[in-house]
């Protein structure tokens, strides 16, 4: 029977360590083995498969029955060896067996470190916790003999010690990370950030450049980025150039700057007005200059601008020239506004010479004290001389109408006697006609007196002949008077037509 038993049940091989594969194996839905918890733990990466060990005796090499394997529910997991820490061999823990079993805990979230880790983990589990390389490397280091020699209580103590050291390690790692961040904090604050605290950097760069150069001459360091910051150097140089240019251009005129000083400045206006008064001292009188200099203390912008332009304006004044008209030695008797017409023989019509001021002047003769008169007429505006004739005894004068007078006078253009027509108001025409008639009669009487004085005393036989001569003279004068009257009638008709 013993031989049959040996043939049916093969001998149990010595315990062998089973390593976890890269790919997780799914548990079958119908499986109800007591190692289901181990399969669930195997799915996560932070689990090392336990070593199946059974008690062996040197006497019997046959395995016990399945009931004995199920009755022994304790399965010992190999300790997780951490590099640099030895497993603690202390007293067995007094915790119950339910707590001695390793319970799956969530991953501990740690703050990201500024520097990348030098060692990278090849793979990770489903819950994000990286696989420990020590798990695969530490298990082969333990031989089956050492595992078999350890008691269950010692193994449980080692597992608990490792669990207690893991949070301590996490805390220590967090503390070290905080210290590293605190150490790197000042370094990052000292580092240059583009556009940050630009005013402080620009203001202090002129003061601290010399000191930094003296300090860094012997031992240059990388903590002073301003020494090599070309942007700040350019800003400092541009600021220096701007200050220099501002000092240089401060004396130049800027439109709209210091308007109150430039416009409403009484001293400046007084200086300008005084200079202008000096230039125009020869032209203006003292009273006018003093009145211009006296300006009110408070004046509006328009008044000040007008005063400034008046003071600075250079007036081109012509020298006063004495006007010589030739009438200085004559006394004016009558002047009137009128129109002057001249009779054209070729066209038999009246041609207007112009309108202006007609003056009747009297002048005493130097020879015998007799009165000499003349008519002078100048155009209005240009004062062009259009009539200048003396009154003589044979001058013909006739009143053509109520507002016109026809006279014979010397023409200034061709120096000949022509017939002129003077048209004016009825009042002026009546005064002019009366004045001319009175002077012509006086001239005629004087001519007659001169002729009588020159004539010798007549003989008694020669008297009839003289009477005949006088009658002949009267006959000669009569036709001339008739012709003059006919011309006067014709002139009246033409005057009415022209007017």
Swiss-Prot record:
Kindly provide the PTM information from the record. Answer: Phosphorylation at Ser-58 promotes its import into the nucleus.
- Comp. bias regions, Polar residues: 57-66, 116-128
In this UniProt entry, the residues modified to N6-acetyllysine are 9, 21
Where it sits in the cell: the answer is: Cytoplasm; Nucleus
Q: Which residues carry this modification: N-acetylalanine?
A: 2
Keyword Transport (UniProt): yes
Which residues does the record list as Phosphothreonine (modified residue)? 56
Compositionally biased spans, kind Acidic residues: 466-476
Which positions does the record annotate as the modified residue Phosphoserine?
Answer: 32-33, 40, 58, 151, 265, 285, 287, 304, 471
Q: Where is the composition biased (Low complexity)?
A: 481-499
Query: What Gene Ontology terms describe where this protein resides (cellular component)?
Result: cytoplasm; nucleus
Main localization (coarse): cytoplasm
Residue intervals of the RanBD1 domain: 310-450
Region (Disordered) spans which residues?
Answer: 1-128, 141-196, 264-303, 447-499
Q: Where is this motif: Nuclear localization signal?
A: 49-57
Output the SUPFAM superfamilies linked to this UniProt entry: PH domain-like
Keyword terms: Acetylation, Cytoplasm, Nucleus, Phosphoprotein, Protein transport, Transport
Question: What biological processes does GO assign it?
Answer: protein export from nucleus
Which InterPro entries does the entry link to?
PH-like_dom_sf, Ran_bind_dom, RanBP1-like
> Basic and acidic residues bias located where?
1-10
User: What is the annotated role of this protein in its UniProt record?
Assistant: Acts as a cofactor for XPO1/CRM1-mediated nuclear export, perhaps as export complex scaffolding protein. Bound to XPO1/CRM1, stabilizes the XPO1/CRM1-cargo interaction. In the absence of Ran-bound GTP prevents binding of XPO1/CRM1 to the nuclear pore complex. Binds to CHC1/RCC1 and increases the guanine nucleotide exchange activity of CHC1/RCC1. Recruits XPO1/CRM1 to CHC1/RCC1 in a Ran-dependent manner. Negative regulator of TGF-beta signaling through interaction with the R-SMAD proteins, SMAD2 and SMAD3, and mediating their nuclear export.
Name assigned to this protein: Ran-binding protein 3
Organism whose genome encodes this protein? Macaca fascicularis
